[in-house]
């Protein structure tokens, strides 16, 4: 059920409102725990889809990354020129239009 909810959120919400018995409430509580992406799962650059304590790191060219506990981007990972989050001692060096790579 978790996969169905992540792919088809509208259908998932419809099922919750359609069934109001105890099993629907229990299922809703289980669903709430899977709304955020766990460490190692894909995320968007905004990072709002990562679970608490995680942030979106290691972006690719499309602006997607992986949820991780680290607070900065390591050497060799993509970074935004306008909002660089490279680790200490690294700079975001331009590699294309609007993005770069963390390097020394």
From Swiss-Prot:
Superkingdom assignment: Eukaryota
Keyword set includes Signal: yes
Record localization: Secreted
Coiled coil: none
Segments traversing the membrane: none
Positions of Domain repeats: 36-67, 72-102
Signal peptide: 1-22
Annotated spans, 2 X approximate repeats with cysteine pattern C-C-CC-C-C: 36-102
Secreted recorded as keyword: yes
Disulfide partners: 36-51, 43-56, 50-67, 72-87, 79-92, 86-102
Keywords assigned by UniProt, alphabetized: Calcium channel impairing toxin, Disulfide bond, Ion channel impairing toxin, Neurotoxin, Repeat, Ryanodine-sensitive calcium-release channel impairing toxin, Secreted, Signal, Toxin
Tissue-level expression: Expressed by the venom gland. Not found in the whole body.
Domain notes: The presence of a 'disulfide through disulfide knot' structurally defines this protein as a knottin. This toxin contains 2 'disulfide through disulfide knots' that are separated by a short linker.
Family: Belongs to the xibalbin-13 family. Double-knot toxin subfamily.
Other comments on record: Negative results: does not affect alpha-7/CHRNA7 nAChR, alpha-3/CHRNA7-containing nAChR, Cav1.3/CACNA1D, Cav2.2/CACNA1B, Nav1.2/SCN2A and Nav1.7/SCN9A channels. Does not elicit an increase in intracellular calcium in SH-SY5Y neuroblastoma cells.
Function: Probable neurotoxin. Induces potent, selective, and permanent activation of ryanodine receptor 1 (RyR1). Does not significantly modulate RyR2 during toxin exposure, but surprisingly RyR2 activity increases somewhat during washout, suggesting a binding to the receptor. RyR1 assays of recombinantly expressed domains 1 and 2 show that domain 1 causes an increase in channel opening, while domain 2 makes this activity persistent, probably by binding to an adjacent receptor site.
Name of protein: Phi-xibalbin(3)-Xt3a
Organism, as annotated: Xibalbanus tulumensis
Lineage: Eukaryota, Metazoa, Ecdysozoa, Arthropoda, Crustacea
